[in-house]
Each structure stands twice: as structure tokens, then as C-alpha cells.
Design a protein with these regions (language model features):
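N-proximal helix/coil linker or "cap" segments that precede and/or mark the start of modular domains
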Residues: 142-188, 199-202
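Flexible helix-coil transition and linker loops at the boundaries of alpha-helical arrays
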Residues: 69-78, 108-125
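Thiol/disulfide oxidoreductase modules built on the thioredoxin-like
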Residues: 271-323
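Alpha-helical segment of the N-proximal tetratricopeptide repeat
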Residues: 43-67, 71-72
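Short active-site neighborhood of thiol/selenol oxidoreductases, capturing the structured segment around
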Residues: 195-221, 225
Length: 330
């Protein structure tokens, strides 16, 4: 999973979201990750709270964040710290605590939004997105999947035009997309001359590989993708690799669209030779529709056009091979 570390701060928070982590070990790896891989410096209360969570002191972490919020109820860093407590509780499978803390985080953030837009800076949208994500996953874990979807869809109505839209949509898809018709792909613009057409995909199993030009994990995963395409392509598998512009190249923000397109094309040529024969639709609407707040995101679609796997983050060849074997069966 790529945590948006290569995106300049002004742009980074618009597209970043933490990948859902099923177990405590995965969460601890994130909690102990270098600060350079996180949003901003995240010193102070966020760092101390995350350290307490890594030490499995969830109560102490919560008390620390709440004390900071008593002193300054609208402090963005303290709100983000509290959201991390909910994430830590979820990773530790303490679902009741995760739900309670995430609800508290949401309530506190909503109470200060009359003072500022959600996207005035990066930390509050990260905290609110995490609050909804943790609530949804905790509710689902407690057997209340319908309530989780109601929560997420209500949040989408209110925040569907903000930076947390893709994260909310991702969580809706995690709970409900399997077995449903694949969301349509926007194909008005492609990166290369290879076009995605209905004729090329009708009745074919699909692997959708959502990637970003700055994404290190995507560059690593393409080796796995190349191996699997060579193995399953002759059996009918079609690979599609949607991407989008992000408005930056390295540390430069507000890059013109044509210049960024050239940069994406050069990145594709250098790091993704496999994608020379793969359609690459270029549109932010595809990322919005599929809830891509994590790159890569992988989606497997069967011959009937139904989604069988929706996975934010990297998968190994060992994980993908049995899924693809089932997918390509006539």
C-alpha cells in the first residue's frame, strides 16, 4: 500500500487514505512507520498517541487525545490523534471501543465544521474519513452491515464533494460491491493508443489495476501483474489499468494537465512496459466511482460483468492465482 508520501502536502491530503488493516500486526506496522511516510510532521500529540497504541495502551492513548481536546476542542492534530485510537481499537478487534471512539471523533469534528471547511487543511479530513471507516468496519464486525452502509451513504451525501469522497466510497464497496455489476469506466481519454472498448471486454474476465504515477507499490506490483497476465491472458483474462492526473509532479504543485500527461506516459514507459499493450483510461471519475483512495487498488470482474474481488492495496501472486483461476473458467 502506498501512503501518499510522494505527494506534496498541499495535494497529498486530497487523495490520501489509510488502507483497511485486518489485524493488529498490520496496524502496528503503520503506527510505527517513519514520520516521513505520514501526513506532515505529525509530531506532538499524534506521535505520542500512536506510540501508546503501538504499546497496546489504547486507554492511555484515548485519555491523552481527550485531554488535548479539552484544552483545544478544534485542534486538528488532537482530532487526528483521537481518530488513531479508533483505528487501533479496530485493529485489536476491540469493536465496541472502536465504535465508541470513532463516533466520538465524528461528533467532535462535526461540531467544529461550522468554524471551517472540511478541507481547510489535511488533518481533519483524515480524521473524519477514519472515523467513518472505523465505524463502518466495527458495525460490520458486530453484524450490523446494513447500519454501516446507511452511515457511509449518509456521509457521502454530505461529504461527496470533499477530499474524503473516495475513502467513503471505498468502504461502501468493501461492504457491498462483491457480486454486483462493475461500475462503468469512463473511457473518453486514454494514455496510449490502446483503447478500452465493449467488444474487447464482453464476456471476458477482467483485472482492473488502478495505479498512480508516483506510487512505489504500483511499480513493485507490476512485476506480479506481468507474471499473472502471461499465465492467464491466454485463458481470456483482460487487464485494464486506469489512472488519473493528480496535479503534481514530485514536489511541484499545479502542474498543467498536458505536462502531467507527458510525465505519466514517461513513467509508464520506464516502469510499466507491460502496460504498453493494456488500455489505460485516464480519468478522475474512475477513481471516484471505484472509491480508489489507496493505490494500487485491484478489482476482479467475472465474465458476466460482476465484481468478485475488490481489494485496496497490493496482493501477492499466491493470493491472486486461485482467484484468477476461478475467474477464467468458462
Amino acid at each position: 500500500m502506498t501512503l501518499m508520501s510522494g505527494i506534496p502536502r498541499a495535494r497529498r491530503f486530497r487523495h490520501g487514505a489509510w488502507r483497511w488493516t485486518a489485524g493488529l500486526a498490520g496496524m502496528l506496522a503503520i503506527l510505527l512507520a517513519p514520520a516521513a511516510a505520514q501526513i506532515g510532521a505529525q509530531s506532538g500529540i499524534v506521535q505520542r498517541t500512536r506510540a501508546a497504541i503501538a504499546d497496546r495502551d489504547l486507554r492511555g492513548a484515548e485519555q491523552m487525545a481527550v485531554r488535548a481536546l479539552r484544552q483545544s476542542p478544534s485542534d486538528a492534530e488532537a482530532l487526528l490523534a483521537l481518530s488513531w485510537v479508533g483505528r487501533g481499537a479496530l485493529a485489536a478487534q476491540q469493536l465496541d471501543m472502536a465504535l465508541r471512539v470513532a463516533q466520538d471523533t465524528e461528533t467532535r469534528i462535526l461540531s467544529v465544521l461550522h468554524l471551517r471547511p472540511l478541507d481547510a487543511e489535511p488533518q481533519v479530513p483524515l480524521a473524519l474519513g477514519a472515523a467513518y471507516e472505523v465505524q463502518a468496519q466495527a458495525l460490520a464486525g458486530l453484524g450490523a452491515r446494513s447500519e454501516a452502509l446507511i452511515l457511509l451513504n449518509r456521509a457521502l451525501v454530505r461529504f461527496g464533494k470533499t477530499s474524503i469522497q473516495a475513502r467513503l466510497q471505498k468502504n461502501v464497496h468493501l461492504l457491498s460491491l462483491r457480486g454486483q455489476p462493475m461500475p462503468s469506466l469512463v473511457t473518453e481519454e486514454h494514455l496510449t493508443d490502446v483503447r478500452l472498448t465493449p467488444a474487447a471486454t464482453l464476456g471476458k474476465p477482467l483485472l482492473l489495476f488502478f495505479w498512480a504515477h508516483w506510487c512505489a507499490d504500483c511499480k513493485e506490483f507490476v512485476r506480479t501483474l506481468s507474471t499473472l497476465r502471461a499465465e492467464f491472458g491466454p485463458r481470456g483474462l483482460v487487464v485494464v489499468a486506469p489512472t488519473q492526473r493528480y496535479g503534481h509532479i514530485g514536489a511541484r504543485d499545479d502542474v498543467p494537465a498536458a505536462e502531467e500527461r507527458r510525465h505519466i506516459a514517461m513513467t509508464r514507459e520506464e516502469f510499466y512496459p507491460l502496460l504498453a499493450q493494456v488500455p489505460i483510461p485516464l480519468s478522475p471519475r474512475n477513481f471516484s466511482g471505484y472509491g480508489v483512495s489507496t493505490t494500487p487498488t485491484l478489482v476482479l470482474v467475472d465474465r458476466k460483468g460482476l465484481v468478485q474481488t475488490y481489494h485496496p492495496g497490493v496482493m501477492t501472486a499466491t493470493e491472486l492465482r486461485p482467484l484468477l483461476s476461478a475467474l477464467v473458467k468458462p
